[in-house]
Amino acid sequence: MATFDKVKDIVVDQLGVDEDQVTMEANFTEDLEADSLDIVELIMAMEEEFDMEISDEEAEKMSTVGDVVNYIEQNQ
């Protein structure tokens, strides 16, 4: 499964949004209505799924689904 598909599944599961809302350009807070706790939980789920650690500093830079996908692909 491609990185985007895995990330999309996690976002749909964690935020309860429709799959078609989750695009590379979708902003977590503006488009997907995630709050700060949702984002922390998303990052934790990504770390578990991809067996990696994402620093708080890096997590703060991630505002879109594409940001997360690109970070994972560059750091796996």
Curated annotation (Swiss-Prot):
PTM characteristics: 4'-phosphopantetheine is transferred from CoA to a specific serine of apo-ACP by AcpS. This modification is essential for activity because fatty acids are bound in thioester linkage to the sulfhydryl of the prosthetic group.
Compartment(s) of residence: Cytoplasm
Pfam families named in the record: PP-binding
GO cellular component: cytosol; membrane
Region forming the signal peptide: none
Alphabetical list of SUPFAM superfamilies matching this protein: ACP-like
Keyword Cell division annotated: no
InterPro entries xref list: ACP (IPR003231), ACP-like_sf (IPR036736), PP-bd_ACP (IPR009081)
Pathway: Lipid metabolism; fatty acid biosynthesis
GO biological process entries: lipid A biosynthetic process
Gene Ontology molecular function terms on file: acyl binding; acyl carrier activity
UniProt cross-references to PANTHER family, sorted A to Z: ACYL CARRIER PROTEIN (PTHR20863), CARRIER DOMAIN-CONTAINING PROTEIN (PTHR20863:SF76)
Protein purpose: Carrier of the growing fatty acid chain in fatty acid biosynthesis.
Family affiliation: Belongs to the acyl carrier protein (ACP) family.
Protein name according to UniProt: Acyl carrier protein
Lineage: Bacteria, Bacillati, Bacillota, Clostridia, Natranaerobiales
UniProt gene name: acpP
